[in-house]
Amino acid sequence: MSLLIGYFLGSIPSAYLVTRRLTGRDIRQMGGGNMGGLNTFREVGVGAGAAVVLMDLAKGALAVSVAYYLLIQNAQWVILTGFAAVIGHNWPIWLDFKGGKGLGPAFGAMLFLLPVYGLPQHLLILALLVFIPLAITRNIALATGIALFSLPFLVWYGSHSEFATLISVLLFLMIGIKFVLDNRKNLRDPANRRNLIVDHWKRPDKNS
């Protein structure tokens, strides 16, 4: 039950709904085609992008909150529910299983999981691992990738839980593989490969 709830909450297509409501267009046909906050920010606007980010974070946080408080699941099932929310975001049943990369619901779940299971300081470390690379590179994808890569080490150091560490590794691999698959055309071009590392956060000039 909790896994289904996690999947269906994660599969709510936030970027699609916000963009369709504001512009009447399909976010999958705009910009890079990704169903996430960054593409919405770049193609629709700051407010729309912020709304999508908050909604995606909420999907992950709500999924694990329901499993923890309402269904009273043990830690393993709560963690798996958060993982299911990321799967739902990446492969939503409502849009032919074509979704985003899972960063929003993943970090949303961690906003709940880390403090609840006694690792609030690791949440601060994770935030620093996002914001410091972001300040240097201006690339939210690279910054969150660094944080996700570090997550298994943080989880193991803080909890020594083999299960939680394994899920952290699988989360990093799933999001990383989804990123590579969704950007395989760009990765073939040296100029585009550079853009995936620097200046990825900048919103394009619509007049250029």
Swiss-Prot record:
GO terms for cellular component: plasma membrane. It is an enzyme of class 2 (transferase). It is a multi-pass membrane protein. Pfam families: G3P_acyltransf. The keyword Electron transport does not apply. The keyword rRNA processing does not apply. Keywords: Cell membrane, Lipid biosynthesis, Lipid metabolism, Membrane, Phospholipid biosynthesis, Phospholipid metabolism, Transferase, Transmembrane, Transmembrane helix. Its EC number is 2.3.1.275. One of its GO terms (molecular function) is acyl-phosphate glycerol-3-phosphate acyltransferase activity. Probably interacts with PlsX. Belongs to the PlsY family. Catalyzes the transfer of an acyl group from acyl-phosphate (acyl-PO(4)) to glycerol-3-phosphate (G3P) to form lysophosphatidic acid (LPA). This enzyme utilizes acyl-phosphate as fatty acyl donor, but not acyl-CoA or acyl-ACP. This is Glycerol-3-phosphate acyltransferase 1. It comes from Dehalococcoides mccartyi (strain ATCC BAA-2266 / KCTC 15142 / 195) (Dehalococcoides ethenogenes (strain 195)). The lineage of its organism: Bacteria, Bacillati, Chloroflexota, Dehalococcoidia, Dehalococcoidales.
